[in-house]
Amino acid sequence: MKTIIVALLSMVFFVNNTNAQGTEESIHRVGVVINQDYFLKFVKPGLNQDRNYTMGAALPVFQYAKMGEKGWVYAPHRFLAKSILGKSVTNYRLADATVMLANTTFTPLYLGNLHDPESEYKRKNDRPFASLNFIGTSFGVKQDSGNELLSIGINVGAIGLDVSKAFQTTVHRDHWFGTVADIPYGWEDQISDGGEPTLLVSGKYDWLIVGKSDGSGNNKGNFQLSANTELRLGYYVSGSAGINTRVGLLDKRNWGMNTLPISSGYSIVSSQKNPFELFLMGGLKGNSWLYNALLMGQFRNSPYTLSFKQLNKFTMEWNLGVGTKIPFCKNRAIRASVMAVGRSPEFSTVKEFERWHSWADLQLYYEW
């Protein structure tokens, strides 16, 4: 962990020294994203159950729109954006290019106590252990008006590595943060144990409904409402539609929001001339599902998986939190947000294993 932090800080200072005098559109953003149900114990102790979506982290997240202009990394993103927009692509301009290294972890309530006489019953009817490690890239273009945004994401990684197993076992065994949870012994039965390549391609379209910039140059506002729709193909086959809102001291150009687990919450890399912001934010999203590899397995046989019949074909998600941007010096700022996120049951087996679950989303960025 110390090595990762040192590398992150070194990258920040190196890029800062070489690019701090960029143009208005060359803003950089580097930061971290942490998803953890542990932090909800301070709201209500019962919400921290190490269950379902247990934890996730992206370290670092780096955003710089000009990365997407050329090169092979974002060539698929540019191709997909042009294919979707067709001739209207000339009315759009680059708004974001993001790269991150990330992990997500999923566990059942039952952590593998082999002395439990109901062990097999619990393993078969709860969700399986699952983990995903990936390099995520995203590319966004917004309409010239600034009120519509198309985002293309591609995640390349592996399901079934031992990163989550090692971290969770260490935390529970050594009682980090005062945890008294059981040591997990079920990771040997995780989805695709030993590792298996995986891929996800996503396309998301956001449009601003209320709080649009009027083009006068006055971008201050107090309320914004946007809608979005998304399609995901790969280790997830699903679609979604939702709404997001921001209320407070706003720069209306910064309306783009992303509430997916382990993603930059800010899908527009705006200009360096942003004012102070402080706002409440919230959203509601409905998801339709045909496939979830982290529940149903992928190509490799896994001892515990859920069937298509057991997969809930419709789920709901909500989010509520607070965000801020604090500018300092001439072109620099700190951006931070804290958000609670909830999700309805993802599968149907027996009632004791079906539940809404929630987690905290923490994001911190340095901009220059």
Question: Over which residues does each language-model region extend?
Answer:
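Extracellular loop and loop/strand-boundary signature of outer-membrane beta-barrel proteins
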Residues: 44-45, 119-125, 182-189, 228, ...
